[in-house]
Structure formats: C-alpha cells, structure tokens
Amino acid sequence: MSPNEDPSDSNSRSNAFKGVAFVARYMGEKLPVTVTVILPTRNEEEALAPTIDAIPRGWCKNLEIMIVDGNSSDRTREIALEKKIRVHLEDRKGYGRAYRTGFDVAKNDIIVTMDADCTYPAELVPTLVKRLLDDDLDFITCDRLSLAEEGSMPGIHGFGNWALSFTARILFGYGIKDSQSGMWVFRKSIFDNEAMRPTNDGMPLSEEMKILARRVLGKNKAVEISVPYRPRVGEAEIHTWGDGWKNFKFLFARRVGLHRTRTPWGSRDSNPDSTNGDLPEQA
C-alpha cells in the first residue's frame, strides 16, 4: 500500500509525534464523525489502563472505546469497567475472531484498532482519523517497522515481521512495509461490501485486512502511514514460531484461494456485553 509516510511529513522522523501537538492545540469544532476504538484483550491487566488513558477525548462527535475480551483470567474486564468503557465478551478463541466480532458490534462510523499493551501511539488517533477524512480515504494501516523504538521488536520478532511482509509483497504485489501491524483506521461502511470482510480467526487476520483493503478498495483509498512503535507492557500472548508459521501458511493459502472461514461473520446474540448489563463477573 502506498504512500508510506508518517502522519505529518515523510521527511522527518520527529514529525510522527505531531499528533500530540494536534490534540493539545485543537480548539476548533470537533471532527464531524463518530469513532469506535477496539482493543482485543486477553489478560492485559498491566497495560490496559494506560492504553485507555492515552486515547485523547473530546475531539470527535462521539468516542466509543471498547474491549473485545477473550475470557481473561486476570482483572482485564474489571479494569475496563472501572474506566467506564464498553466490554464485549467473545469466548471463541482468536485475535481475528475478536476483531470479526468487534467490527460487527462497533456503534460508530470510523473504527480504530490497536493492541492493549501500550505499543501503539494512542495519542495519534485524532491525527489519523483527520487524515482519513481530509484525504477521503477508506482505510489506513500503520507501519511500525520504520519508526520502531529500541527494544520494541527484539530479535526474531523483527526478522519475522520483515520476512512476512516481504513474502506478502512478493505474493500479492502490494508495496506494504508492515503486513503484521495491528493499528488500522477505517470506515465501518467498508464491510457493507462482503468481499471486504476478513475470514481468519487468528493472527493472520492482520495481513488479510491489508490484502483485502488493497484488492477491494484500491491504492487510492487504502494507504500505509508510519507511526512510532514502543516496547510492550505485560506478558505477550503471541506464540512467536507457531503464529509466524500460521501467518506464512495463510499468505500462500490466500494467494491460491484455499483459505476458509471457520466461524460466521459478526457477534453472536448470546455474547455478553456491558451495555446490555449481562456481563458475568471476572473469572
């Protein structure tokens, strides 16, 4: 996907942080959109509160922050409720499954995604949404590799991300730097076209989203922007070798049309949600 640049100026690394200044000095009318930020969670009690606190408030017509929780056994859901954000429980396993549910139940026009581990620059959410609107885009994915901070992607993780992104470029011919990024900004309406709905319930959903965005939306509507990436807070749920191998296999399966959908699109009516008042106590 192209162009690849930071939110302000592709010639300056420091300008990636101008989103903070944008929020601080933003005194005009609110952006005329409603926004849902989706955080998939499983045992993120250490990082969830600072992740939520880092998301700016008051810059759009309505901001919904929601976790889609995969049966956390720590205080993740309790912390979310203390922070007065929406909690949607999804007991079907998988990173992709959490997002395929969250995309369906999100209430607002624009969706922003990121991990609940303090790695992504939550302070840039308003800047990225404004970029989506100003440039009449449908989808933004955020490249972590160009501006990754020291210690944020050590050893095999950095090599694995590079190898998977290189493979995706070769197989699909799309100029994307970071096929595994989990920070995206897009219009919920893209899913009105069923061809844009991802099928994978696991980690490969991340690369699938970018493949579909370029294929369905086109290079003028789907772009990649570089953002800072920071060391995570808390223990990672990802399994480096196992998830890497699944991502690699999925790229080839997608390329030849052998991928398959294991679960239906969207949430189940039985999924507990804090807005419905039927969320069970934390396990």
Question: What is each model feature region?
Answer:
Residues 69-77:
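A conserved acidic beta->alpha catalytic loop
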Residues 18-26, 43-57:
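Short, well-formed alpha-helical segments that are part of the catalytic scaffolds
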Residues 91-105, 122-203, 231-242, 248:
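Acceptor/aglycone-binding surface of glycosyltransferases and processive sugar-polymer synthases
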Residues 115-120:
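The conserved acidic donor/metal-binding loop of glycosyltransferases
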Residues 44-47, 72, 95, 121:
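Donor nucleotide-sugar binding loop of glycosyltransferases
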Residues 34-36, 64, 208:
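Cell-envelope/extracellular polymer assembly enzymes that use nucleotide-activated donors
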Residues 111:
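Short aromatic/hydrophobic "clamp" motif used to bind/position activated sugar donors
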Residues 1-32, 173-174, 197-283:
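Hydrophobic helical membrane-anchoring modules
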